[in-house]
A protein has these predicted regions:
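Glycine-rich phosphate/diphosphate-binding loop of Rossmann-like nucleotide-binding domains
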Residues: 1, 64-137
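Short glycine-rich anion-binding loops that position phosphate/pyrophosphate groups of nucleotides
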Residues: 25-26, 47, 80-82, 138-144, ...
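Short, structured coil segments at secondary-structure junctions
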Residues: 16, 36-38, 96, 114-116, ...
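Phosphate/diphosphate ligand-binding glycine-rich loop within oxidoreductases
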Residues: 1-63, 181-182
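Rossmann-like adenosine-cofactor binding region
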Residues: 113-188
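Structural alpha-helical scaffold elements that stabilize or flank donor/cofactor-binding regions
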Residues: 13, 33, 126-127, 190
């Protein structure tokens, strides 16, 4: 309705709140909000940048099921390029001692992975037998401007979790931040 982000959060801060939870389409918005107010700021997702609150939930879930993550192998599979969850989780899981592998076609990987504590493969079948967690990401179709895969069917064939791959995972934890694209990253018979 025309009010700037700064005006909104300064008004909320003037009410004496202890904290403000910010989810914004612009990368870095929570950082800016923290400069404007004298309250704790929680980043609930900013643009393509980060999603630390999702990461905290994922760390909690992983530790509840697996205990210590040190030495565990975690694959983050799918649309890494457009996923703020991938960025946050790669760092969080690696910080906890896990080996993190990104699995995606080149067109769905960020162009600059320097500094990411990960290895990269373009073949899910190379790592699926060795995983403790298979973390699937949805295709962020709304954030894509070009055709990044030949088809969703081909993406599913190469990178989707089908019954055969799910069986190969054994007791590994299957995770997804939602919402999922049924039949794209996860086969309907696995979901």
């Amino acid at each position: 309705k025309g009010e700037s982000l700064r005006d909104t959060v300064e008004t909320i801060s003037a009410m004496g709140v202890d904290g403000i939870v910010v989810r914004h389409r612009a990368a870095g918005a929570p950082h800016r909000v923290a400069e404007w107010v004298d309250a704790a700021v929680i980043n609930a997702g900013d643009g393509w940048h980060q999603h630390p609150t999702q990461s905290l939930l994922d760390l909690y879930t992983a530790r509840e099921h697996l205990g210590d993550l040190d030495g565990k192998h975690i694959a983050i599979v799918g649309d890494i390029k457009h996923s703020r969850v991938a960025r946050s989780n790669a760092l969080a899981f690696a910080t906890m001692g896990a080996k993190v592998t990104l699995v995606a076609p080149k067109t769905l990987l960020p162009t600059h992975l320097e500094g990411w504590p990960v290895t990269v493969t373009h073949n899910l079948d190379e790592v699926v037998d060795d995983l403790n967690i298979c973390y699937l990401l949805r295709m962020q179709l709304e954030r894509q401007t070009d055709a990044v895969v030949p088809s969703l069917r081909e993406f599913h064939t190469e990178y989707g979790l089908d019954v055969r791959r799910a069986d190969r995972l054994g007791d590994a934890l299957i995770m997804h931040p939602g919402p999922m694209n049924r039949g794209v990253e996860i086969d309907p018979n696995v979901a």
